[in-house]
């Protein structure tokens, strides 16, 4: 019997080890193309032959899904390599083959979930819109969850013929045929082999570029949607919706499906976009914190930059914690999210005649007129459905809810209690980003809440009337940084201040699939519509992409770095009260680690005067300085053989400055020098003088203090020195250097921030 137990145990152990070795995963594999043997006709031939050689050299094994290694995608534009399903033994064999650089497991990617053209001061008579022809013939790629092609935002009224340089396709699939593309939506493709490699039993319910989520449709219409008249979000924000670049061409690459969102599919989408000839890429997805050399968005964006394509990416919605930012690589345009000057309201009229404009997005014309209002400390915590159920005549009663710090839970409980309406007292900035408001009611601030409570306490029969579906413009202050917008510095590389720019991202009206539920009334009435309000840096990134696209149309010779520089150095750090832009998290002045250089100003970006340009070699020099292993360097840069590392430099020619200091004893000590080179993109000769604003407890100096340009496209360099001395209690401090044109109109501003490194890690 003991022998039998021993044999059974040995068999079980062997089976367990076999399954562990045989278990396959999808890997992203980076190869050095310079080492591709001459026998292969192209990269795909090399990749498929590599997998075939693995099959021949490694004993066959079967896991739950796969009986052999399998090639998923071949990549050659934004990176060189492939994705493949491999066991650990097969991966080990692959590592021994010529050209192998690195490999890491496929991972999931997360989404970072109108009036804004007016707020951005875009107009048809002057500035960036007419100068760029509204972005005409620039091709913007939106990598997301697909598109709803029937939307009015994607009709091609007024669009000329498709540019001949376009190489992409309109790929047919489920509920999507090639005729659904047009002169606006010139391309639609989809990528889901990574999902199927992860689990071949999955049934892709919408195997096409059609959007069943809404995120992609919304983002695409923000960046380049055509003019769509007479739209609104259930009566809020009524008017004409239009994208930032309404005459730009859209190419949609769906890599995010209901069944999953994988890195291998994302890379394939970006690789194809660059091959198709797009000018700009907008992506509103990111990862949790991972190293730069495993961040596929950063790696693929580096490859896109090398081919002259700028990537605009969302900073993420994990704010307001310091260092919470995604997509902060030096070659990416990283976009933060801000509130605009538009607010949505319901007017609260008390029985004594006092009118208060409360915040509301209740999606219907509810009839709340002269209804009784009640308030008591226990009930008005609004945290107990049981207590609220004891309210007499709830269908005709308005309850006041105190601020208990959990508005969403209060709204859920109020809705389930089926009360007539509620008056919520809250100053939580998160409340004013959500478009979900299923129960009649308004949100008022604490001061207004006291007025309402005093009225109720001092009235025998207190009543109130609430009207809904109201939209107001020119709210002050605006813009304001959204509390959820992720903050820098970037964990990818601390030496550059990120994010780069602030763009509209809170309650943005844009297109949406009409068969996807958008909001609700009560607990069981689900509503859908063609246009909805959404919030997040996901909405900010396509705004920036649309502006960048128009700058590319107006200045086709500008590099990705020049476009980003123009947007940053002309950004406005002040709000519409001409005071520093505030952070809605703490109501204090925002820093460059919250909002970048400031709020994007498209018309000023058209004519920035000077730009901080950077070549692909400049980014390579930066990578050379980061003490990466050869494997890590080549994973990003593809091949060390094709790059020169003789001049490594961590000081990239960037239009912002960050100095991170360490704490030594009771004092912080810092002295850091930066070298910058600016290019004159004005009309001709010009002279600029430096205007300095030092961060608190700092001195800054610049040499030379005057830059003289004799010709357009001439370059001049300067050195900025920051010296900081302070006690350990000091935190982030802000300054700036502005090059002011003498006898001219240009003002070229770069933010400066000093911050203790201990706050990041």
UniProtKB/Swiss-Prot annotation:
Chain positions listed as propeptide in the UniProt record: 23-112
Keywords, alphabetical: Autocatalytic cleavage, Cleavage on pair of basic residues, Disulfide bond, Glycoprotein, Hydrolase, Plant defense, Protease, Secreted, Serine protease, Signal, Zymogen
Activity regulation annotation text: Inhibited by 1 mM 4-(2-aminoethyl)-benzenesulfonyl fluoride (AEBSF), a general inhibitor of serine proteinases, but not by the more selective serine protease inhibitors N-alpha-tosyl-L-lysinyl-chloromethylketone (TLCK), N-tosyl-L-phenylalaninyl-chloromethylketone (TPCK), leupeptin, aprotinin or benzamidine. Its proteolytic activity is autoinhibited by the non-covalent binding of the propeptide to the catalytic domain. No effect on activity by the addition of CaCl(2) or calcium chelators.
PTM comment text: Propeptide is internally cleaved at Asn-38 and Asp-52 in a pH-dependent manner leading to the dissociation of the propeptide from the catalytic domain and resulting in the release of the active subtilase. Cleavage occurs at pH 5.7 and to a stronger extent at pH 5.2.
Tissue specificity statement from the Swiss-Prot or TrEMBL entry: Expressed in flowers, cotyledons and leaves with the highest expression in roots.
Stated consequence of mutating residue 365 to A: Decreased catalytic activity and dimerization ability
One Pfam family recorded for the sequence: Inhibitor_I9
Swiss-Prot/TrEMBL induction comment: Expressed in response to mechanical wounding and insect herbivory in leaves. Not expressed in uninjured leaves.
Domain Peptidase S8: 116-606
Annotated Basic and acidic residues bias: 575-586
Site (Cleavage) location in chain: 38-39, 52-53
Disruption phenotype: RNAi-mediated knockdown results in partial loss of resistance against M.sexta larvae, impaired systemic induction of late wound response genes and in reduced levels of cell wall homogalacturonan (HG) and pectin methylesterification (DM).
Chain intervals for the UniProt region annotation (Disordered): 574-598
Major enzyme class: hydrolase
A GO molecular-function descriptor: identical protein binding
Chain intervals for the UniProt region annotation (Necessary for prodomain cleavage and secretion): 756-761
Gene3D superfamilies on file: 2.60.40.2310, 3.50.30.30, Peptidase S8 propeptide/proteinase inhibitor I9 (3.30.70.80), Peptidase S8/S53 domain (3.40.50.200)
BP GO annotations: defense response; peptide catabolic process; plant-type cell wall modification; positive regulation of defense response to insect; positive regulation of gene expression; proteolysis; regulation of cell wall pectin metabolic process; response to wounding
Cellular location(s): Secreted
UniProt free text on domains: The mature polypeptide has three domains: The catalytic domain, an interposed protease-associated (PA) domain required for homodimerization and a C-terminal seven-stranded jelly-roll fibronectin (Fn) III-like domain.
Similarity field: Belongs to the peptidase S8 family.
Family annotation (PANTHER family): PROPROTEIN CONVERTASE SUBTILISIN/KEXIN
Subunit structure: Homodimer.
The protein, known as: Subtilisin-like protease SBT3
Taxonomic lineage of the native organism: Eukaryota, Viridiplantae, Streptophyta, Embryophyta, Tracheophyta
Gene name as annotated: sbt3
């Amino acid at each position: 019997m003991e022998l039998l137990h021993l044999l059974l145990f040995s068999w079980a152990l062997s089976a367990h080890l076999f399954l562990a070795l045989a278990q396959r995963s999808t890997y992203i594999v980076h190869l050095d193309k310079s080492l591709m043997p001459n026998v292969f006709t192209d990269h795909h031939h090399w990749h498929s032959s590599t997998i075939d050689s693995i099959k021949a050299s490694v004993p066959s094994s079967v896991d739950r899904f796969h009986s052999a290694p399998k090639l998923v995608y071949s990549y050659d534009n934004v990176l060189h390599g492939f994705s493949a399903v491999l066991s650990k033994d097969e991966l080990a064999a692959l590592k021994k083959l010529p050209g192998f650089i690195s490999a890491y497991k496929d991972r999931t990617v997360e989404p970072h979930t109108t009036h804004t053209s007016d707020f951005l001061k875009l107009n048809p008579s002057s500035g960036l819109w007419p100068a760029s022809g509204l972005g005409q013939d620039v091709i913007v790629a939106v990598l997301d969850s697909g598109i709803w092609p029937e939307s009015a935002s994607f009709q091609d009224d007024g669009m000329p013929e498709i540019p001949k340089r376009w190489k992409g396709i309109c790929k047919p699939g489920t509920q999507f045929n090639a005729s659904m593309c047009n002169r606006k939506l010139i391309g639609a493709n989809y990528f889901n082999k990574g999902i199927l490699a992860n689990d071949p039993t999955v049934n892709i319910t919408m195997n096409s570029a059609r959007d069943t989520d809404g995120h992609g449709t919304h983002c695409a219409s923000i960046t380049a949607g055509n003019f769509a008249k007479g739209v609104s979000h259930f009566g809020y924000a009524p008017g004409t919706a239009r994208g930032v670049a309404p005459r730009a061409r859209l190419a949609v690459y769906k890599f995010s499906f209901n069944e999953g969102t994988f890195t291998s599919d994302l890379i394939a989408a970006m690789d194809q976009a660059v091959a198709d000839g797009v000018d700009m890429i907008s992506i509103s997805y990111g990862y949790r914190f991972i190293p730069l050399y495993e961040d596929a968005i950063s790696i693929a964006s580096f490859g896109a930059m090398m081919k002259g394509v700028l990537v605009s990416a969302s900073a993420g919605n994990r704010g307001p914690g310091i260092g919470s930012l995604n997509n902060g690589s030096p070659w990416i345009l990283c976009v933060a999210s801000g509130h605009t000057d538009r607010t949505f309201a319901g007017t609260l009229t008390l029985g004594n005649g006092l009118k208060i404009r409360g915040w509301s997005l209740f999606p219907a014309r509810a009839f709340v007129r002269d209804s009784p209002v009640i308030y008591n400390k226990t009930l008005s915590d609004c945290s107990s459905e049981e207590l609220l159920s004891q309210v007499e005549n709830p269908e005709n009663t308005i309850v006041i809810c105190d601020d208990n710090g959990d508005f969403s839970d209060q709204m859920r409980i109020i809705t389930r209690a089926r009360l007539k309406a509620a008056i919520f007292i809250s100053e939580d900035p998160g409340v004013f980003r959500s478009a979900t408001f299923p129960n009649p009611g308004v949100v008022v601030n604490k001061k207004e809440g006291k007025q309402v409570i005093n009225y109720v306490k001092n009235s025998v029969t207190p009543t109130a009337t609430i009207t809904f579906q109201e939209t107001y413009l020119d709210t002050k202050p605006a813009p304001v940084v959204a509390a959820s917008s992720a903050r820098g510095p970037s964990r990818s590389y601390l030496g550059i201040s990120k994010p780069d720019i602030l763009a509209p991202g809170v309650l943005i009206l844009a297109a949406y699939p009409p068969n996807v539920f958008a909001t609700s009334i009560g607990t069981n009435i689900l509503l859908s519509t063609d246009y909805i309000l959404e919030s997040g840096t996901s909405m900010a990134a396509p705004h920036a992409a649309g502006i960048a696209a128009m700058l590319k149309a107006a200045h086709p010779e500008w590099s990705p770095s020049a476009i980003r520089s123009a947007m940053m150095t002309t950004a406005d750090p002040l709000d519409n009260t001409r005071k520093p832009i505030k952070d809605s998290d703490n109501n204090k002045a925002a820093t460059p680690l919250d909002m970048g250089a400031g709020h994007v100003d498209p018309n000023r970006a058209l004519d920035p005067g000077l730009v901080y340009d950077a070549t692909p070699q400049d980014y390579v020099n930066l990578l050379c300085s980061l003490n990466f292993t050869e494997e890590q360097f080549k994973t990003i840069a593809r091949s060390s053989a094709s790059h020169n590392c003789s001049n490594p430099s961590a000081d990239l020619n960037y239009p912002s400055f960050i100095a991170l200091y360490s704490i030594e004893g009771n004092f912080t000590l810092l002295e850091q020098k930066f070298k910058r080179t600016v290019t004159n993109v004005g009309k001709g000769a010009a002279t600029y003088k430096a205007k300095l604003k030092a961060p608190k407890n700092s001195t800054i100096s610049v040499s030379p203090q005057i830059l003289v340009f004799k010709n357009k496209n001439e370059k001049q360099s300067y050195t900025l020195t920051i010296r900081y001395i302070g006690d350990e209690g000091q935190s982030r401090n802000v300054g700036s250097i502005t090059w002011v044109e003498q006898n001219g109109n240009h003002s070229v501003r770069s933010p400066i921030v000093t911050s203790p490194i201990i706050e990041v890690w």
